[in-house]
Amino acid sequence: QADDPGDFDWLGAILYTSAIVTFMLGISWLPDLEGVGLMLVGMCGFYGFFRHQHGRDHPLIDVTLFYTNRIFTFSCIASIIMYTATFANIVLLSLYLQYLLALSPVQAGLVLISQPLVMAVVAPIAGRLSDHKEPGLLASFGMGITAIGLALLSTLDQASSIYAIVIYLCITGFGFSFFSSPNANAIMGSVDKRQYGAAGGAVATVRVIGQMASMGVVSMVFALTLGAVQITPEVYDTLAYAIRISFSVSAAMCALGIYFSYSRGQVH
């Protein structure tokens, strides 16, 4: 623990909060011009925050980690990509199951629970393995499996079986489990003990950014393909197309994320 924790950086907190809120509001309003403008304002806010934090004795976030620590930076980028690619999947599949397959909310929930069940079993095992094996390799493997699962989900149509959906969800959950725990291990293992707080905050921040970006990407895909219409049987084919496009984009993002995950360097 530091002998002199310093005063709380109120200006930095305001800049950071304003940048996050503005950027995420912009994502939610895409593809409208107002959304693009808000995203640009948010990016300017992030730039101002990083400039403000650089060189401070007691920064809210040690931004030098992003400049000097390749493992930390690439792990955070991989995390953002993974959460952007996967967080909105439950929303997409909920729409798919209830509208296109005519399942009840309870039935849809029973199908969707297959992914978190797999994650609950596999994630502790992956975390334990990452203590002994190179976490970057395990995380890259997990991201690759997730990309395969998302690619399979992008093939769904109104004739797909429930069993196929459950299998695809289990594959995606297995891959995500092998990514999340080793990736967090890589982030925490790449910093000194005195930086654990900053690294832990970064893990939470990139997770939230990825989750909100995921909803923004799906919203943009739906706006471009489906538009502002009520979901009725007349637009089910277009809805299915929008869902397939969303999963295809997610699979492509995971494929890109493999590069950052694999190229981060060795932790152990």
Model segments located where?
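Hydrophobic transmembrane-helix bundles of small-molecule transporters
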Residues: 1-77, 111, 251
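Short, charged juxtamembrane terminal tails flanking transmembrane helices
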Residues: 4, 265-268
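Transmembrane alpha-helical segments of integral membrane proteins
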Residues: 26, 227-232
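12-transmembrane solute porter fold
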Residues: 35, 58-227, 239-266
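Intrinsically disordered, low-complexity Ser/Thr- and acidic-rich flexible linkers and loops
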Residues: 233-237
